[in-house]
Amino acid sequence: MSKHTNIPMFRIGIGYDVHRFDNINNDDSNTSITICGIEINYHKKIIAHSDGDVGLHALADAILGAVGCGSIGQHFPNTDQKWKNAKSSHFVIEAQKKAQERGYIISNADIIIICEQPKIMPYALEMQHYIAQFTSIDPSFINIKATTTEKLGAIGRNEGIAAQAIVLCSQQY
């Protein structure tokens, strides 16, 4: 990494993640998926190498991008057994450390979950507080929202789930 004498005051990053659902409609009420750290009862499972948390994957990707550290796939490749079934909060914590090493803090995060099912908004506040807890970011600077694709494409056919995140990083003082 080159040393900059004029570090930008602000940097913005965007992240994206998508995972397929399994094809089995599981009637087992113990089946759940994890989104932004919160377990949600759902009749399908996410197919993933780690815990498959698209919200936190997108957030980690956005943080890494904001500070010029590449992508989540570069730091936590799905070909590495070390990350098998890993909790996605670990990815966000490590991305946050990279930002801090480069002189930045996360000032704001906006995460959108894209799916037809399950419904996300009943869990949004809990997700916001979960992320705030392990990142030490004020919950009012974390936003969680959800949308559908109006039944268009693979996500519209409920074959998977996606997330996008954008973060604003500011210079540490």
Swiss-Prot record:
Pfam families: YgbB (PF02542). A divalent metal cation binds at residues 17, 19, 57. It catalyses: 4-CDP-2-C-methyl-D-erythritol 2-phosphate = 2-C-methyl-D-erythritol 2,4-cyclic diphosphate + CMP. Pathway: Isoprenoid biosynthesis; isopentenyl diphosphate biosynthesis via DXP pathway; isopentenyl diphosphate from 1-deoxy-D-xylulose 5-phosphate: step 4/6. Keywords: Isoprene biosynthesis, Lyase, Metal-binding. Its EC number is 4.6.1.12. Its cofactor is a divalent metal cation. 4-CDP-2-C-methyl-D-erythritol 2-phosphate binds at residues 17-19, 49-50, 76-80, 147-150, 157. GO terms for biological process: isopentenyl diphosphate biosynthetic process, methylerythritol 4-phosphate pathway; terpenoid biosynthetic process. Binds 1 divalent metal cation per subunit. CDD domains: MECDP_synthase. The record marks 49, 148 as: Transition state stabilizer. GO terms for molecular function: 2-C-methyl-D-erythritol 2,4-cyclodiphosphate synthase activity; metal ion binding. It is an enzyme of class 4 (lyase). Signal peptide: none annotated. HAMAP family: IspF (MF_00107). Belongs to the IspF family. This is 2-C-methyl-D-erythritol 2,4-cyclodiphosphate synthase.
